[in-house]
Structure formats: structure tokens, C-alpha cells
């Protein structure tokens, strides 16, 4: 991954003790007398020091970016798990705020089983909290990284869900504009959840959009040409790229740089793998059509032969959104028992205020996380041992026929769709706690109080200038109609945001262009230059308007007094681990040689590159031109018209950004652990007392084995000793978070090879074996593959 600057702290103290009003707005109140009420009535006791936001107990940070972070949380009243996106509004300019609220308002009107659901919006003066559905299976991107291409039967199950969700957006007159494997999540049952509507916008038949946004490998040719477009056709092209990626494990169009990629997209030539079926090839030809007028519509594509193979009796049809059931008496009775009145429940649901009442009602329609096989505080947020509902939206009597049979073949569980429309089966024996008198957030969310794993991502916010939307109005508040323009000018983002363009998740936008600034990216129908286009990535002003929210794989660069960059490792996401380690140029460790993770690994099962600039999402606004130079190893040449395997590109950083990092980072003094350059929790510091305390602990059981790299019948403790031995032999730093879980770090940040990952010994009850689970936390896929392969091959299990 490319290196990045440290991220500004999201100020979460603003939310202490706020009152939720009927319109969804929050009023900050005094702290006196509030915390006691929450402690008495919440599941957590007062002794539990975990911070809270509203009715949610925060569990851990699962993502972090320039202006936002994402936390896994548990709804206190129902026990359901959610993802909370916390956005620091003070870091966003008015345009960014406008786009942020547009994203929220669009999410409110989308109700589809394969789209991430919004439950609640909490807004204070400085912070916006979006409580959303938690998809525990991670990204399709990461799934492909771990497994390579899908078999067509599995790809079909996923793709039917994707097409259904995108077609639903189109029939709602919403265009996503940033469809890619990174924005497709998987729930616990391996069902698709489309996320990140930061670039989405309303389209109107007869009017054109002209914003160039999206990830370049997924972008339609008309976007590269600077042409205006209706909307849906750019999503259709992106879906074609996604289909190709699912089936082949590689991208149809790729290049060493943006110029080469653009040429290949405009040429429209791509390689058909020998294993791809004729029906799949024919379907691709309906998606990847250079002329947008001749490109197929999703309604037409839903009738395609490949789409419906094996589903002849359940032909894919447009999703019919059932009427929302807001009168489920069973849920209402439970909420009355929690302390809500019938009147306020009916008022909130009838107006869909997306306040704490709406959220509680919606979450009651979901399977309780307390029935999960493993504790939510488990270190692996990708554990598939969790069993959660796919959605609260499907209705057994009202859903489209295709949803009955669209379960992924990789899932061994039946889809669970606890409906908000027909009413879920809620166990009557569950004792729900009463709510506190006011919705409080008695949290002191210090960075050292909530240890979090820093992860690279784009900033969260708006996406450049977009045309006024009749549906969305000009409101800056997602819970109200139009409100007056903000009087206070937002804080100017610091220059350290400039490095955000170096990671794959950063988004830049060529906003709706006037004649004066069209030349910034397209000049006379031609691309001006690669360096000019990528100058947007280095522009702080550009990045303050970005909004992508899977905030992961963060690395920070520090500049020493001598001018040599040092790599700052992020803090560990466990109790009290707030130390960091620095790898100086003198402490660089050699890059591991490349090996395949297992003998069964084929060239198809290769890693996607994450850090390349060309893999980032575009939404670049016209900025002052700058040149950007790139370092790192030269990329190997690839064949023209060939589909490039997703591991063959290399991360490229922008060296002229280093000077921008100095101001923030030179103020920070290294800690004792940083001076030592090694984690305290390495094997050299594991005390015998700790081993005695954990001697009786048992490995976590996993139902699924797709994240396992090796299995063994050896005793788990002996396996851990062998793992530590191999890590030491490969000069890896590591910290033992749990009895059978290690957090590992390897690489030289100066060479962009720093990798962080987890290794966990897990029990595989179905196989009567133990396995070693590898999970990448940050770093490029190639660097992770190198070190993971080397370690896996050296383990003598």
C-alpha cells in the first residue's frame, strides 16, 4: 500500500449526552444525571468502560479515514450488531457536506435486500453518525484476493443479486456511479450488500450528467472521453467489468498508467479466458459495448440466458419493493416494554424519521447477534461463524421470485430474511432492557480509550459538485427539508490530507464541468496528461470532498529530523495497546521471496493490487495543475488487449507528497516502543504468567474454512509455538492479543512492503482438525502474499 499521513482524530466528545428529538436532530445536554440512567438500563453495567453513542455500545474500530471512522457497535436495547460511520463535519467544506447529506438522503429511500440498510442518523453540531447494517463477510474484493476467480455457478448467484440491486436503484432514478468489487460487501450468509453511495445521484430522463467519477478500471469509455451521459449506462459498463472480474479473477482493462488504461478502454478489446462459457461471453458483450446507446439495459439483461441458467423457473425480474410494515404489534409491544410510548412509536415510524425509535423497530426485525456462535468482540470481523439475517426488507409474500433462489453456492446456510414487512419471528423469551430516559452517548472516545486499528481509506464526505436534485433538494440536513446555509465556514483541512490520493480507496471527481475548467482533465476530447490527471490525487482541496467508507489498510509516514522517512505502525486494536513501532531505514527487514500460499494456488488465484493510483475512484474537481512523480519498482510490461491479472500491477506512491507530511508529523515525539522499533507484545516479552492464565483457553471454532491457509492435527499450543518460531525466523514483529491470536507486522515501509496481518489458530469441528487463519489488515496484496506464502511454507505442522 502507499504510505499515508496520520489521520485527524474524529472528535467524538461532542456527542456526550445528547437528546434525540423527533426530527432526528440531537441536542447536546449536560452530563449530570445521564450516565446513571444509561448504566441502570443498558445491557452493559457501569463497570463496563466501553464507550457509547446513543443506544449503541462501541466494540471496536473497523475502519478509519481522514474525516471519518467506522466502528462496530451493538445496539444496547436489542443486542443487534451495527456499523457506525462517524464523520467529523468540521473537516468538511459546504460542498462536501452537501454531498454527504445527499448520500444519506439517497440511502433513506433505498430498501433492497442486497443494499446496505441505513437504520438511524444522529447529528450533533460537529459530528454525524450513520448507523448502518453490518456486513460481516467483508468485501468481494477481499474474497477474490483470498480465493481467486469464482466458478460460474457461484458468480451467477452473486451477480444476480448485484444486478437486482442496481436495477432497483435505476428504477428509483438513482445511479450509483462507483460500482466495483471494493464496494460490494458480503453478509454472514455470503449475500451481496452494495455500499458506498457517496457518488450516487438522481438522474432524469432527457437530462445529462457530466461528472467523471468511479474507479478507472471500471469506468465507462464515455467518461474517459469527457462526454455527458444519462446515468444508468455507466453503471451497466461497470457491471460488465465486475462480471468479468468475478469469473476470471482479473480485470478486462488495465494498464501501467492511466493513459494506457484509457487507451485500452476506448479500444474496447479484452481477452476471453478459455474457461469462460459461451453464454457468459455473450453476456459480457451486452455490457461492454463502446457505444452507450447500444449498451444493454438491466431490464433486458435480466432475461439473459446466462443470468437465468439453473433458475429457469425463477427468472430474474425487477425487484418489487413491498410496502413497509410499520404496525408489527409484536415489535411494538417489545418497544413499549422498553419505555417507548405507542404515540411516539407510531409518529416515528409513520414519518420514517430514522431516529432511535425507527432504528429499534428495524433492528428488532433482525436475528439477535446474541445467538451467534462466537462473541462479537472476536478479533476477526470477517469470521463467518456469525449467523445474521441477510436483510430486513424481503417479504416472503412480496419479494420477487428470483430472490428465493439467489443464495450463494458458497454459503452452507439458508438465507435469513427477517422481514420488516411481514414481521419477524421474535423469541418471546428474550428479555429486552428498558431504554434510558434520554438517548445518551456518555462516551469519552479518546484515541487511547478506544484502541483502534488504523486503516487506510478515502475521506468520508461529499463527492464534488453535482447537479441540483429535485428529489433531494438543497438541504444540508438529512433529517429535515431545506435549511439555511451554514453561517460558519468549516475548518480548512490540513495539508496532510493530500496524501490520501495514494491509496486505492481515495476518490476524486471531475465535477460537472463548465467550459472554463473542462480542460483540467479532457482537452479537445483528449486526455491532457497522466501527471495532470493525477495531480488531483495530491490536492488537499480535492480530497476534502471525498466520501468512501470502507476505511481500511492505513499506513502513516513520519519524517525524521534528518529528513529520512520513517514508518509509523498503527496502534493495535485491543485493550490498552496504544503503543506504536517505527521502522527506521537502519532497521529495514528484507522483503520475503515470493511463494504460492499452497500448491493448489493457480495463476488465477492472485492478489488484486490495492495501492495503485489507477485503482482509486475518480471524482476529481478542477484543481491547479501539479506534476506527480512516482517511485517504486517498475511494473512489468503487459500485453495489449490482455486482461491483466490483478496482482501484476504495483503500488505507486507520489514522492512529492513527502514534504506535505512534515508539518504534522515532526511535532510527534516517538514513544519508548517506537524508539525500540518493536512491539511490546512480541514473543520475547510474553510472560509465563500470561501463558498460565490462558492455558485453559480453547481455539475459536469456525464453520467455514475458506480463510484457512493450512490445517493440522497438532495441539493448538504447539501450533502457536511453531508459528512464533517461524515469525521470529522471518524477523516479523508480532503481538499476542489472545491465546491463539497474533497480530503480525513485517516489511520496510520505505520500500512500500509493510504488511500487517492476523494469524489465528482455529478449530475446524467439521474436519476434526485445527487450522491457521491468515487475515490481511493492511499493506499491498502482493507484499502480503509474499510473506504469508513464505510463512505458510515454512510452518512444520
From Swiss-Prot:
Annotated Protein kinase domain residues: 56-307
Residue positions, PTM Phosphothreonine: 211, 602, 617
Activity regulation note: Activated by phosphorylation on Thr-211. Inhibited by phosphorylation on Thr-617.
Highest taxon of the lineage: Eukaryota
BP terms from Gene Ontology: intracellular signal transduction; microtubule cytoskeleton organization; negative regulation of hippo signaling; negative regulation of protein localization to nucleus; protein phosphorylation; regulation of G2/M transition of mitotic cell cycle
Positions annotated as active site in the UniProt record: 178
EC numbers, comma separated: 2.7.11.1
Annotated segments matching region Disordered: 1-35, 372-504, 585-701
Domain (UBA) ranges: 326-365
Biased composition (Polar residues): 391-400, 492-504, 585-602, 637-664
Broadest EC class assigned to this enzyme: transferase
Catalytic activity as recorded in UniProt: L-seryl-[protein] + ATP = O-phospho-L-seryl-[protein] + ADP + H(+); L-threonyl-[protein] + ATP = O-phospho-L-threonyl-[protein] + ADP + H(+)
Reported modifications of this chain: Phosphorylated at Thr-211 by STK11/LKB1 in complex with STE20-related adapter-alpha (STRADA) pseudo kinase and CAB39. Phosphorylation at Thr-617 by PRKCZ/aPKC inhibits the kinase activity.
Membrane topology: Peripheral membrane protein
Alphabetic keyword roster: ATP-binding, Cell membrane, Cell projection, Cytoplasm, Kinase, Membrane, Nucleotide-binding, Phosphoprotein, Serine/threonine-protein kinase, Transferase
Chain sites annotated for binding ATP: 62-70, 85
SUPFAM superfamilies per the UniProt record, alphabetical: KA1-like (SSF103243), Protein kinase-like (PK-like) (SSF56112)
GO cellular component, one term: cytoplasm
UniProt domain KA1: residue ranges: 748-797
Modified residues (Phosphoserine): 42, 368, 374, 376, 380, 383, 400, 419, 469, 593, 596, 636, 651, 654, 687
Bias (Basic and acidic residues): 11-28, 669-678, 689-699
Annotated localization: Cell membrane; Cell projection, Dendrite; Cytoplasm
Amino acid composition bias (Low complexity), ranges on this chain: 374-385
Record-stated family: Belongs to the protein kinase superfamily. CAMK Ser/Thr protein kinase family. SNF1 subfamily.
Quaternary organization: Interacts with MAPT/TAU. Interacts with DLG5 (via coiled-coil domain). Interacts with STK3/MST2 and STK4/MST1 in the presence of DLG5. Interacts with YWHAB, YWHAG, YWHAQ and YWHAZ. Interacts with PKP2 (via N-terminus). Interacts with CDC25C. Interacts with KSR1.
Protein name: MAP/microtubule affinity-regulating kinase 3
